[in-house]
Amino acid sequence: MGRYSGDPVRNHALRHSARNGSSGTRLYIGTPDEPPSEALLNCVRELSRRSLVISAAYAFNMAVGDNLPSLSIGLYFDTKPNLREVEELFRQFGRNIRPLISDINFVDLLPLDPSNLLGVAVRAQIKPFYRRVVQ
């Protein structure tokens, strides 16, 4: 949904399983060897806390087909989110995380929900770095 210049990811081998997407393309998801900076994770945590529609956030490497893996931040929604709402949230996230990542690398910001394969796969394989606490 959004790509922002970001922290370096040097992991070229993913440790988790591959899945076939609906088009037959292999999708590889894994834990980064070098996690994103704590400043970046804290920024995403704080922004996620402010949004009632985000229930969890995940940092993972993802590769599609034969492409090299890239760092992704997945924001998990309990239900399929409204596109306008996601676009506004991602603009806000982009403005806030851009200063925390270098100019030569990038971070993919992705919406995750129970209705898409990526959301199901990430939730099954990656531990969230943020989880909404309901009181």
Task: Tell what function each PLM region has.
Residues G2-Q125, Y130, Q135:
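A contiguous, surface-oriented mixed alpha/beta subdomain in the mid-to-C-terminal portion of proteins
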